[in-house]
Every structure is written in structure tokens, then in C-alpha cells.
């Protein structure tokens, strides 16, 4: 038995969906432990492109328990759309489970998210406008609505009274928006609750039962390390904890239950929205990476900012997550480049530093110090073994592993499942040196 956490080692969009889908074959239970519909992952199966925001990637395999954990925030309207999409594609959803204590994104959360972001003007943080931040804020203020509340009319009417009164006051007096009606929301969300009721479970009990029965559990994070509320580039972060420690809180398990942590990183770096980005590129190479990598957000459709691989944030991700190994994705996007650069340190006010400054003002001043490597200028899309890779591609991967001081277990060379080199299965394989 092995319990594995999959995290993003950059600013999200690293390709965690594909890696989680790949590892789900060896897992019995797949748990999404934080975030909401602000995250998105794309999986390509038999030329079918499936885009999911809440449902764990393991749903595409039969006989898997796929659990949306207590640390998530759930927009039931979008969740039901995902369920319908999967049913339309003849995918069995009987293994889908939803924590009764997950908090629910309500209509006023989405409206407030958009209004607050617009009000920030030039100081906007780049929110997706899906209501995630306001939902987590209500959770922290003990003013939130949980999935269990959608299963009882009187309960829902009771718990919604205070937050709706507060939110209507904000909508009317601050933003000049028409207030929402209690009955409209209650009826709509009771309907959602009824449709979702057969999936609702006690999250912690479900996971601990699986663990007791020696099942393999895969914990799936959303977003990435640099978007972590406490350890990311604050305030340009998400409202939850995507790092590996967040799996324990969001799923309701102790750290001793985690056997291994795998980080997912692109062979270059991307970021969506606002905030400092030391290795960001401009011009033709930026456009080339964006176009070849299809760098447009699954959730928002926004064009992603592209840059060279940043080893400083990579080493930071290794540290704060306790990474055991790494999955490098989109290596094929670099195929046509004759020269590739990797950031090995920063220049901060004339001083060379090799650590990640968590102060966004300092990070904004950091200038990348690069190491140049030779490109391979040939396609890697059909490589299925390390021996198939061009020598310079191998050199590049080894350099990343040495720089980050963590072995590489998986290399992804395209969107399809089979466009992958699995050096070692992090769930069933022994802990040993992989590609260094």
C-alpha cells in the first residue's frame, strides 16, 4: 500500500490532471483535497477531450472511489454539469463521493467576487470570478453553507439567513447591485442537494476505512505551490493550501498516512493572472511556448504568461512540499528551440540569491540568472523510453533533477495518456533514485 500526494510545483496549470489520471490506474481512492471550480484539468482519452474542475481525474477509471474532500469548496451547479457531461460520455460515476462538510459556493459569492475584483482597479489580483475567495472567507468566519445543509429545507433556510442578509447589504450599499431573494436561493439549492444526495458521505470516515483496508490513496491538489495562501506569492494567491500539507487538512488525515509526495512541473514556467514572474518572456519565444503548449486556462480561457524554467521556485517547492520525486510535463513544447535557458539564481538589489523571497515586493525586483543549455531540435512526441530521447533532452532533464535535488519519475511529452515515459510508478515502485 502507498498513499501519494500530487501537487503543482509552480503557479498551477502544470499538467497535474494528466499525471493524476496516469497514477489513478494504480490507486483505489482518489481524493481532491482543496480548491474549487477555479481549478481545471484537461484529460485526453481516445481523442476525447474531457475538462474537469471539481471531480477527481480518477473518475475515468472503473471501480475507483473518487472523493471531493472537506477542504474543497463546491459549486453544485457546475458539479452537476460535470456529472452530466461524464454521463453523456458513458463514464460510470457510481464511485463519485462528496464530503458532507465541504463548503458551498452560493450565488452571492460569485457576484461579490466579480464586484470586489472590479473595485480593485489596477490592484486586481487576477481572481477567476468563480466565488472561491468569498466562499473560503465565509468558511473562516463560520458563516458558510455546507453540503449537508442542502439536504434539509429548514436547515438551509436557517443557516442562510445571516450570511444572505450581510451579503445583500454589501451588494446594495457598496456595489449598487440588486439584493438576492432567500426563497429563490433555497429552492434552487435544495434541488441541487437532492440531485447530489446519493454521492454525499463522511469524508474522513471514508478515507480512514480505505486506509484500514490497505487501499492505495491518491491525494490530488489543485493550483500550485506558488499560489498557496500561506506560502505563495501573496496576495497573488488562491484562498486555500495546495501544498502537500493541505492534503492532511483538506482530507482529514494525519501526516503519517502520507507515504510519498510527487511534484508536477512543466519543462518551462507559466502563470495566469497578476503577480511577479521573474523568468517571464516577451516576444517570439513567449508566443512560441504559448502556441505550442496551448497555454490558455481551462477555467477562464485566459492566455497564460510563459517563461523559462525557474529552478529557484522549483527548489522552494521541493522544500515546502517535501517532494520525493518529480513529474516533468510538456517537454515536447521545447522541441524546436536551439537554446533553452534555466534560472539557477536571482539577482536581488545586486546580491545573488538562490532562495525564493516570499515577499512579493522583493520577488518583483528579482532578476533571473540563467544557465544556457543546448536544445535538441527534433520531436520527442513519440518517445516512450528514456533511451528514445535525444541526448540534449536527457541532458536537460538531468540538469533539472540536479538543480532541484530531486529525482524525476515521469516525463510527459504530449496531452495523450500514451505520450508519457514512466521511469517509476510512484505508487507501486520502491523509493530509490530515478533520473538524476
From Swiss-Prot:
The region annotated as signal peptide is none
Q: Which residues bind IMP?
A: 13-16, 38-41, 128, 142, 223, 238, 302
In short, the EC number is 6.3.4.4
Reactions catalysed: IMP + L-aspartate + GTP = N(6)-(1,2-dicarboxyethyl)-AMP + GDP + phosphate + 2 H(+)
**Where is Mg(2+) bound in this sequence?**
13, 40
Q: What job does the chain carry out?
A: Plays an important role in the de novo pathway of purine nucleotide biosynthesis. Catalyzes the first committed step in the biosynthesis of AMP from IMP.
For this chain's record, the cofactor binding note is:
Binds 1 Mg(2+) ion per subunit.
Tell me its family: Belongs to the adenylosuccinate synthetase family.
Its protein name is Adenylosuccinate synthetase
Amino-acid biosynthesis recorded as keyword = no
Compartment(s) where it occurs, according to its Swiss-Prot or TrEMBL record: Cytoplasm
Grouped into one coarse class, the protein's main location is cytoplasm
Give the binding site residues for GTP.
12-18, 40-42, 304, 330-332, 412-414
Which pathway does the UniProt entry assign to this protein?
Purine metabolism; AMP biosynthesis via de novo pathway; AMP from IMP: step 1/2
* Cofactor(s) the record lists: Mg(2+)
Q: Which SUPFAM superfamilies match?
A: P-loop containing nucleoside triphosphate hydrolases (SSF52540)
